[in-house]
């Protein structure tokens, strides 16, 4: 079963499908360090460019015109998330007037093109739950190309992810993966990391910063910032017996037992990445790749559901 991944990021979504023995034909991603991460771990070809400059027909040729069974992908969520204090007030403006929001339309163009080549195509588009504010418009756009769509909100922690993460998965099938019996908490996620693991370098902090974070209790944060409608937190001290909060691109977490930030590897553990999944780019770029991805364990749960349909 063949998959293409649009707006692939570092490859968390693709990794989940690989783990269920799907074949990744190719991906589109436009940021070089992220592409390097994807190529190293997923080992599938990537067209590195802005999707606006890649017509579906050209990408079809790039993957040698092979049959596409599944399209996955995660158009940028910034235009739709309330964490963005510059989010446009009119929901439709987020789709049509925000140049980043318009990337969703390119995803739909790809679905349209590959549907014409395979009537049984399945697609899954990931975004933040707030994208439901343009639900009717998305129903119309997908309906115009022959697809009834379902708006599936899935919580990654229900499938074994150690951090909370509610996301919308818009698809032409209902997605109801089997949930795990027991949640995975921070302490369990962070244990037994080999000292020589990749991406496991500890960031040196100033004495003043160490003193500040030493005074924090579990569940407290050093910094706060204003989202569109609510206060957001960063440098959050993790509670060892609970789930971690949602991992975002700029999220930084404090170790529950040590006065330091989590390493990139530890943060990747919170998003269910295996230790042999290596991240490239500067440290901030690595953190960002993790926070902007679909946890592989959730991607795999979705892949299992799709297998039933195919």
From Swiss-Prot:
Q: What is its EC number?
A: 2.1.1.37
Entry coiled-coil feature ranges: none
Q: What class of enzyme is it?
A: transferase
SAM-dependent MTase C5-type domain: from which residue to which, for each copy? 1-310
Q: What GO terms in the biological process aspect are recorded for it?
A: DNA restriction-modification system; methylation; negative regulation of gene expression via chromosomal CpG island methylation
Entry keyword DNA-binding:
yes
- Report the catalytic activity: a 2'-deoxycytidine in DNA + S-adenosyl-L-methionine = a 5-methyl-2'-deoxycytidine in DNA + S-adenosyl-L-homocysteine + H(+)
Instruction: Kindly state which keywords UniProt assigns to this record, in alphabetical order.
Output: DNA-binding, Methyltransferase, Restriction system, S-adenosyl-L-methionine, Transferase
Active-site residues annotated for this sequence: 77
Which family, according to UniProt? Belongs to the class I-like SAM-binding methyltransferase superfamily. C5-methyltransferase family.
Role played: A putative methylase that may protect DNA from cleavage by an unknown endonuclease.
What name does UniProt use for this protein?
Putative type II methyltransferase M.MJ0563P
């Amino acid at each position: 079963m063949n998959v293409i991944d649009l707006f692939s990021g570092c490859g968390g979504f693709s990794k989940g499908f690989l783990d269920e023995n799907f074949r990744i034909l190719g991906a589109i991603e436009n940021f070089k360090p992220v592409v390097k991460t994807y190529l190293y771990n997923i080992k599938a070809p990537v067209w590195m460019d802005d999707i606006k400059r890649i017509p579906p027909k050209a990408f079809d040729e790039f993957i040698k015109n092979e049959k596409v069974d599944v399209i996955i992908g995660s158009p940028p969520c910034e235009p739709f998330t309330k964490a963005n204090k510059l989010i446009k007030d009119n929901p439709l403006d987020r789709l049509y007037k925000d140049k980043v929001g318009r990337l969703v339309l390119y995803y739909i163009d790809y679905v349209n093109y590959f549907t014409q080549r395979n009537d049984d195509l399945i697609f899954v588009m990931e975004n933040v739950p707030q994208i439901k504010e343009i639900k009717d418009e998305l129903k119309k756009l997908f309906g115009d190309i022959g697809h009834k769509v379902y708006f599936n909100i899935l919580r990654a922690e229900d499938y074994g992810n150690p951090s909370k993460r509610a996301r919308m998965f818009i698809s032409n099938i209902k997605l109801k993966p089997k949930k795990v019996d027991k949640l995975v908490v921070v302490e369990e996620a962070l244990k037994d990391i080999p000292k020589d693991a990749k991406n496991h370098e500890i960031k040196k902090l100033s004495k003043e910063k160490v003193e500040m974070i030493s005074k924090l209790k579990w569940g407290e944060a050093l910094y706060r910032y204003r989202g569109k409608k609510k206060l957001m937190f960063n440098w959050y001290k993790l509670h060892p017996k609970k789930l971690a909060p949602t991992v975002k691109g700029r999220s930084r977490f404090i170790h529950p037992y040590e006065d330091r930030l989590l390493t990139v590897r530890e943060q990747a553990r919170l998003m269910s990445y295996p230790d042999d999944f290596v991240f490239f780019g500067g440290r901030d770029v690595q953190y960002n790749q993790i926070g902007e991805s679909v946890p592989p364990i959730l991607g795999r749960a979705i892949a299992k559901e799709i297998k039933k349909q195919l």
